[in-house]
Every structure is written in structure tokens, then in C-alpha cells.
């Protein structure tokens, strides 16, 4: 059930961040996405009644037990380090745009 819920969240949003409210790495990722103007769904696992089950299901699905657990365009990206590395490499913005999390701007 929890895995199905996680997959539904991932498939229903251009960007999904499984997070915990007290996690500084989660805050960093959400701040970065916000600064880039990305639309994302944050699921605060410590506020969800089935949060620990969702986290366990995510670990089984992705092999990652920690938060944040970031998905862009239905693809597992990883955590804070992976997300910020993509940004440093100039690859995050194109991924977000391709996923539909950032509106494409017209140059006309």
C-alpha cells in the first residue's frame, strides 16, 4: 500500500520530494527547487501517519533509506548531494524544465 502511494505521488507530480520537516538537507533541496521556480510536491514523512511505511517502501524501491528522496520526471534522482551536484553541473534546470516543473519561457 505504501509503495503504491509513493509511486502514485511520483507519477502524479513533475517533481516529488520525500522529506522530513526537521531535516536540514531536505530544507536545502526544497529551497533550491523553490529558488529555481520549480513546482514540486513535498511529502513530509514525519507528518504523514504512514510516513515510516512510505520511507521503508521508498528504500525498497530505490535502495535509498535517507531523506530527501527526490524524483524528477518520474526518475529517481537521489538525495541532497545528487540534486545539488546536478545543479552545479548545470543539469538540474533542464531536467526540471523537461519534467514540466518549470514553465518554458518564450523568447519571441
Curated annotation (Swiss-Prot):
Lineage, broadest ranks: Eukaryota, Viridiplantae, Streptophyta, Embryophyta, Tracheophyta
Protein name (database record): Glutaredoxin
Subcellular locations according to the entry: Cytoplasm
Organism: Solanum lycopersicum (Tomato)
Segments crossing the lipid bilayer: none
Pfam families reported for this sequence: Glutaredoxin
Molecular function GO labels: glutathione disulfide oxidoreductase activity
Stretches assigned to the Glutaredoxin domain: 3-103
Main subcellular location of this protein, as a coarse class: cytoplasm
Similarity section: Belongs to the glutaredoxin family. CPYC subfamily.
